[in-house]
């Protein structure tokens, strides 16, 4: 069965306002948007193994070592995973991206081979953003394309807002802008119900309920699932849940007090519409919090892990957008 995605492009109209368009002019900035609007979600081929994916290394972020896998040469692209996940979530995107870029897929602190400091305060957004900054500096670069999924998306949003000079472009997968999520938590009963898992993760003792096998249940590829179980066995369950304890909004949910700084670089968002944890209503009005172009690609039939559910489409979308 062939499914179709729809690309919406929000661009600055030259007056400081944003307008939304659904088509593009061939040969112009947005020539590829029309192609994406009818691009089928194709069946995915075999994924590279961990060993085939790239070269492993470590960057120092304060007292914490951050593990990464890198391949390719060119401008730097930093890939940031979410929960429960690790760098290998990008295995289907890394080969194509590395043809034009140096791709660095990092393990966030607490996960897999990165250090796992103790204490909720060690997982503040400031610390997580600092890890991305350290990775970019480790490769001798002043800026990078920053790509994030789930919690990696939250870190990427925050990095772009606090380090605009280091953010070339921003790619976000299945993670609304923080203002959009907070608005939905405050006003949308369905989002409140669907966020019960996050409230449970914030409770004392929640980590004792987790197992590596349980965290890997969503992985459909048997070979990859084995890798995931091993990665989660190396991880800190307390560290994983500290992302929620340190950064996820708590009840009573309220509207954002401050919208924060606007993102100053172009943004690509890709969102699988079957995601029940992060409902698509939170995507509304994202353009209000950006200074430049927003391209939003929604993917029917794809779940929360859109980079794996619709790997071919996500890869081609990212490559086309980054090469424009």
Where in the sequence are the language-model features?
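Mature N-terminal segment immediately following signal peptide/propeptide cleavage
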Residues: 57-72
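Extreme N-terminal basic, low-complexity initiation segments
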Residues: 2-4
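Bacterial N-terminal signal peptides
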Residues: 27-40
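Flexible "cap/lid" subdomain of the alpha/beta-hydrolase fold that forms the substrate-access gate
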Residues: 45-53, 64-66, 76, 104, ...
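Catalytic histidine-centered segment of alpha/beta-hydrolase-like enzymes
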Residues: 302-310
